[in-house]
Amino acid sequence: MLPASPATIRRDITALEQAGKIRKARGRIFLEDIRKAPSYEMRDAMHDEEKKRIGKAAAALVREDDSIIIDAGTTTLALAENLRDRSHLSVITNSIPVAYTFNATNVNVFMCGGMLEDMALVDDDAVAFFASHQVEKAFIGASGVRGITGLTVVSPFQFAVKRQMVRSAREVYALLDESKFHIMGVNLFADFRELTGIITSKPITNERLLERLEQEHVKVIYTE
C-alpha cells in the first residue's frame, strides 16, 4: 500500500464522489453501480447540438390541432422547446421539464401522476393514465438500441410507461442521438415493427439494422 496523507485521501474521496463513482453515508463509503444510466443533468449536457437538430426535425412532423405524447428525456425536451409557439396543440407527458417548457404558452398540457424518478413520473398510476388516452403521435426517447430488435431503457419503472406510450399512439417516432446506437440497454420496450419512424442525426451504418427497418417500413429521418 502506498502512503498517503489524510488530506490527500479526503481530496481523492471528494473527487470520486463528484464523479459519481462512490457515495458517502453515515461515515461509510459505498461504490456506486456504474452500470446505471447517467443522471438527467449529465445527459442534458451530452450531445447538445445533436439533440437540438433532432428536436427541430421532430417538430416538423407535428401539425396544428394534433394531440401528442412527449416522453421524458433530454432529446424529447428539445422537441418541446421547438413547439412552444404552437397553438391548438395538446401535449400529454410524464416529464416535469417538458411540462414546464409549455408554461405560459397556448399549448394544452396534460401530465400524469406517479412516482418521481429522474425528472419523470412513473409507476402504475402513470401507466394507467397513458392507457386512458389515444393520440395521433408519440415521440419517444430510449437508453439504447438492441441490435436489430428494438428500443431499450435502463429503468424498469420507465419501461412500463414507455411501453404504454407506444400502445397509445397511432404513429410512434423514436428520437435517438447517434450514441444510442452503440448502447445495448436492458429492458426492451418497443420492437421496431411498432415504430413509424426514427429521427437521428447521423447515417445508420449497421446494414442489418437498415434492412430490418426497411422490412418493417420504418422511416429514417436524418437531421440537417
Where are these regions (language model features)?
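Short beta-strand scaffold positions
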Residues: 70-71, 93, 200
